[in-house]
Every structure is written in structure tokens, then in C-alpha cells.
Amino acid sequence: MEEGGGDENGMEQHPPAVRGAFGEGNGVNVKDEVRLLSIGIVLAALLMLVCAGPAVSAEPKPVNREIPWDVSALSKPPKVYPATERPANGMRAFFYEGADYKGKPTWVFAYYATPGGTPPAGGWPAVVCAHGGGGTAYPNWVREWTKRGYAAIAMDLEGHLPGGKDHGMEGNLPLGAGHPNAGPARIDYFGDRALPDKEQWVYHAVADVIRANSLLRSLPEINPKKIGLTGISWGGTIVSTVAGVDSRFAFVIPVYGCGFIHESDNPGLAQWFPPKNMTANQFRDYRAKWDPAAHLPYAKMPMLWVTGVADPVFQVDIFAKSAKTAGGPSSMCLRPFLAHGHGNGWEDAGEIYTFADNIVKGGPPLPKLERPEINPATGIAHTKYKGDFTEAWVYFTTSGGQWQARKWNFIQCNVSEKELVARQRLPQGTTAFLIYGFRVGQGNQRSNHAASELVEIKP
């Protein structure tokens, strides 16, 4: 998408809602997450893949899955051990027991806190927080939830003790420090693919998240019916798998991360799969066990999928396909210029907390758009919706090829009580589009970001 007020077709190119650039912030470890990937600020549309009718893409095919985890054993409360190595103000630091690694139980470092005051009837709602690649347990992520009335646990999923000075870390201690009872560290994306299942990082990351749920459910101050899960980047991919394996969660919110990694046209992801990497058996195991695509059809809880329009790691096609594959209610939140990073992934999308409040506190729901359609006589895109919008736009592209390289343009919509209608027709050659809305409040604050399904138009 290029700067400017319009193109040769008279289409708007930068709606006021999306002017600007990516903000500064402490990102997910870019070396780990985006290796061999040249990151450009290129808008990409998002959302659920529309598959009805002859002109759009086909339904995702189901994948036969295998479950390498002993879910029954992981559903039992884990043992907890004291931790003095990495204190954080206002919260508990401890180890809890994870899955066995090479015949020995692992210990998982975690921060945990509850809101101040007396718990509500039934106990606090709670959230499990799964970090992304190169990340760790972050105190400020826990604090973001506790200030909103939730208990929260954030754990290190890479066999490390927390370190550094970002996101509430204290002491500026070394990054990536291990401990004697750690499980396996992550080896790039799939560098451990030749190892036995129970020695691979994804196996332990998923198990550690399930165990965190089991721990919360055992605490007397927690309401076991109101425990949610969220993950950022690679953590978003992990929680997308957990959603289909651990049915006890009340809601799941993947941020940036998703499934169908093997179908990505991002060179940094595609390099790990055949023909460059993985044997035929390893690829079969990956699809059946480790990719969220195998497990998402079994995820029946409400899910909110959150990303920016220019995410540099998980492109629109696989993100949208993941959302469509989920077996329960699946909603999408499109935040223009949501930078890919820890901090950004919990601070810059208030819809995360609106969604959680709706599920476990009875708060108002996020808006919901129906599948957009094109009037065959006029070429005008439109969709019905429920919710509170003051502004809406059609995002469309006439480009093909890699999603990262596609250019996107915009057409403003008229907002009526129940329908969003584009003010101009889509140009010939449109290859994909969606309709996106939000509410502008006092001080130009934008909220209620939501988008329709992504429609891919085949030639």
C-alpha cells in the first residue's frame, strides 16, 4: 500500500484509521521468529477464508490427527516448588512440574498474581499467558490482566529463567539462563524434528500450557469455569494447538500466531518443509501432531484471533484458514499497524479484554460481521453486521503471488444501523477483499475493531 489519497481508479488508499507506521516496541526475538525473512511494511488483509460459491477458495480439508500427550495425566494438578532466582514485585515466582524429559520431571518457571481485594463469588477469572519465540515469563503481562480483574500466570516455555530488562523484568539478569530441571529449549523453528516426540520442544510447550491450566484450577481463589488462554506469536501457534487438546479453557485468544505453517508462502517458514527440509515421515508427523490445523476442528470454546494488517511472520492466508478451521465460535480482530511483539500483543489491542469480559463476566460482545457479498449488478461490496461501528472500509487487492508483497487499497463504506455498504464498486481483477469496521470515541480513541471473513476471488 502506498502513501496518497487515491489511485488511478479513484479508490481511497489510506483511510484515516490506518495512517501511520509501526510503533516502537520490544518485539518478539526477530532473529528467532523471522530468520531469512525480509520484513517490509506491506499491508495485508486478514480474516476468515470464505469458501462458499464457485468464485472463492475451497473448504479446508480435515487432517487426521494424533495426540502424543497424555492429556489425562497433564490434567492433574502439578507439584509446585519455590523459586527465589527471579523475584518480581507484587507476584509469586515458582516452578511447577511439567512433562517428563528423558525420564525426569521438568520444572517450569512461572509468575502468578491475583487482583487485589476479595475474590468474587466462585473465585477470580484467570488467564494463562504463553510467550512467543525468544520470550519468557513477563511480569507486566501478568499485571495487565490483574489490573483488569483477572488472576494470571505467565511461564517460560523454553527451559529458561526470565532475564533482561523488558516488560517488568527486574535486575537485568542474563537472558536465556537455564536451570537444572529444565525441559528442552526451542531449536529455531523445527530443528528438533528428528528427535522422539517427547524430546521435541512443541510437545513440552503444549504440555506446559495444559499443566498451567491444571494448576490454576487447583487454586481455591480461582473459578475453574472461567479460565482463558492467550499466546503471542509462536505462543499463538502453541495455544491454537492447545485449544483443540484441552477443552477445559473458557476461551482462547491467539495473537499473530496460527496454524497451517506448512502452507505459508513466507520463505522464513516455508524453508523448514519439503522439499528443503523434513523427511516424508517427519512431515506426516508434523501435520498430524504438531501443526494446529490438526487440532483446531476439536476446539469448541470461543476464540478471538488478533493480528495486525501487516504481520511479518504469519500471513493472512494461513491466519484466516486457521480461524475458519476452529470448531467453535471464531471471531477476528484486525488492528491496523499492530506491531509484532511482546508488549504490543497485550497492550495495543483492547479487544482482547473486551472479548474475555464478554465470555466470563457477561460484558458487551465485540461486533460481528457477516460474510461480505458483491452485488452482481453494481459490483458494490456489502455486509450485514451486529455491533457498534462509526466507520468502516473495504480492503481489497488486485495483486496475486506472495501475500507479503500484495498491495492493498481501500474504499470507504456507508454505515447504517445493520449494514455496511461500499461507496464505490470493486475494480475488475480484485483477487481478495474484506470489510472492516471500528468505533471512534472521545479523544479519537478507536475500539471495537472487527472484520469480516476474507474473500479470495479465483479467476
Each PLM stretch: what is its role?
Residues 121-123, 187-232:
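Gly/Ser-rich "nucleophile elbow"/oxyanion-hole loop immediately N-terminal to the catalytic nucleophile
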Residues 299, 305-307:
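Short beta-strand/loop motif that positions the catalytic acidic residue
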Residues 357-396, 409-419, 423:
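Surface beta-strand/loop "capping" patches
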Residues 312, 316-375, 387-388:
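Catalytic cores of secreted or luminal carbohydrate-active enzymes
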Residues 143-207, 258-273:
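Cap/lid segment of the alpha/beta-hydrolase catalytic domain
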Residues 72-122:
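N-terminal cap/lid segment of alpha/beta-hydrolase-fold proteins
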Residues 121-132:
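Short beta-strand element of the alpha/beta-hydrolase
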Residues 210-275:
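Primarily recognizes the serine-hydrolase "nucleophile elbow" in alpha/beta-hydrolase
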